[in-house]
């Protein structure tokens, strides 16, 4: 402690918080608050969750946007309200466009209601106009946007059936259209455009997608800036940090893009995991301390390959503690009393 206090401030800064984006996805926040959830900081004081995160080193927030959800959840209006709070808390905004009315993931990529499922020309224009409108709406409300993801976990395509992997030429066109909707918007600073696949540890899957979609000639390397991946260690024993490092290294070198992990979690309770955990993570406990250890090692992996960020997925979704996994609790908030766990402070060290 004494020695660190004698170091020049510039050196202290360089030895911590090396990642550009130390983030979290808190898309569910407004829904949680509407249900009566109030969060407590490490001192046990009630505080807005975005402020708790900002005060503990988070500098960027990821938000999922659905096109026309039946109950309004995660629509444009919802996300604009959340983004204003994020910006007021001093954090950047990362918009995750699902391009669907509901969850988009490797198993579900449903085209929004009212969008074409039969004509690719029409659908491409709808994607362009939608992304343009989203970005212009944020611009009109003086909310800056740092990153926009065109689609979510699109390894199996997007906007099915036209954008399925039976039609990589269509996938390329849809991604190109979405990218240019962002580029043509009135945002004063053009957001970085990101494409996002699941199973970030699986280099073969990543390579096949990008090689195939870029080979069409419709999607250009200049259309996007970042490659994002999901990295969930509890879904596959092959999801080792070593495999992730290889995949991220290759993604960056092959395609010339900065890489980041845009979804990840670690459990505090996982009594009966459906799948074995990866061998190089098996020593990490299921606990708040384990969350800190895992994220620290993940950050080290990102830094080793020149990666730029990590986003923890839904650390405060207390009504969904398992976050879709076979583990009982992956949160950084105690779902019983809504107090954040000590692991929340790890972001300042990433």
Swiss-Prot record:
User: Catalysed reaction per UniProt?
Assistant: The enzyme specifically hydrolyzes (1->4)-beta-D-galactosidic linkages in type I arabinogalactans
Instruction: Tell me where on the tree of life, at the top rank, the source sits.
Output: Eukaryota
Q: Per UniProt, which keywords does this protein have? A: Carbohydrate metabolism, Cell wall biogenesis/degradation, Glycoprotein, Glycosidase, Hydrolase, Polysaccharide degradation, Secreted, Signal
Where in the sequence is the active site? 153, 263
Any one Gene Ontology biological process term? cell wall organization
- Which GO molecular-function terms appear in the entry? arabinogalactan endo-1,4-beta-galactosidase activity; glucosidase activity
Cellular component GO terms, alphabetical: extracellular region
Kindly, how does the activity depend on pH for this protein?
Answer: Optimum pH is 5.0.
Q: Where in the cell is it found?
A: Secreted
EC number annotated for this UniProt entry = 3.2.1.89
* Endpoints of the signal sequence: 1-17
Residue positions the entry lists as glycosylated: 129
Query: Matching Pfam families, A to Z?
Result: Glyco_hydro_53
Q: Which InterPro entries match?
A: Glyco_hydro_53, Glycoside_hydrolase_SF
Q: What does this protein do?
A: Endogalactanase involved in the degradation of plant cell wall polysaccharides, and more particularly of hairy regions of pectin.
Q: Which family does it belong to?
A: Belongs to the glycosyl hydrolase 53 family.
Q: What is this protein called?
A: Arabinogalactan endo-beta-1,4-galactanase A
Q: What species is given as this protein's source?
A: Emericella nidulans (strain FGSC A4 / ATCC 38163 / CBS 112.46 / NRRL 194 / M139) (Aspergillus nidulans)
Lineage of the species this protein comes from: Eukaryota, Fungi, Dikarya, Ascomycota, Pezizomycotina
């Amino acid at each position: 402690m004494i020695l660190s206090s004698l170091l020049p401030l510039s050196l202290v800064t360089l030895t911590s918080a090396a990642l550009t984006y130390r983030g979290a996805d808190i898309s569910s926040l407004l829904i949680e608050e509407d249900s009566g959830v109030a969060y407590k900081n490490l001192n046990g004081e009630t505080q807005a969750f975005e402020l708790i995160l900002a005060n503990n080193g988070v500098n960027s927030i990821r938000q999922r946007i659905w096109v026309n959800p039946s109950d309004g959840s995660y629509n444009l209006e919802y996300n604009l309200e959340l983004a204003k709070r994020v910006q007021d808390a001093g954090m950047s905004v990362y918009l995750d466009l699902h391009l669907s009315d509901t969850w988009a993931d490797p198993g579900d990529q449903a085209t929004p209601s009212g969008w074409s499922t039969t004509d690719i020309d029409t659908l491409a224009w709808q994607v362009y106009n939608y992304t343009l409108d989203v970005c212009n709406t944020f611009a009109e409300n003086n909310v800056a946007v740092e990153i926009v993801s065109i689609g979510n976990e699109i390894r199996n395509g997007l906007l099915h059936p036209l954008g399925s992997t039976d039609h990589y030429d269509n996938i390329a066109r849809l991604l190109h259209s979405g990218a240019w909707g962002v580029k043509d918007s009135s945002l004063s600073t053009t957001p970085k455009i990101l494409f996002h696949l699941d199973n970030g540890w699986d280099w073969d899957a990543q390579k096949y997608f990008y090689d195939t979609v870029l080979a069409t000639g419709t999607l250009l390397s200049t259309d996007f800036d970042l490659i994002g991946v999901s990295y969930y260690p509890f879904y596959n024993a092959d999801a080792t940090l070593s495999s992730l490092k290889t995949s991220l290294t290759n993604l960056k070198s092959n395609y010339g893009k900065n890489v980041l992990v845009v979804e990840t979690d670690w459990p505090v309770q996982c009594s009966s995991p459906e799948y074995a955990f990866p061998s190089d993570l098996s020593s990490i406990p299921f606990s708040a301390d384990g969350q800190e250890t895992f994220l620290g090692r993940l950050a080290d992996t990102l830094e080793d390959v020149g990666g730029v960020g990590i986003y923890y997925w839904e650390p405060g979704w207390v009504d969904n503690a398992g976050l879709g996994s076979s583990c009982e609790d992956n949160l950084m908030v105690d779902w019983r009393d809504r107090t954040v766990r000590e692991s929340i402070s790890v972001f300042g060290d990433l």
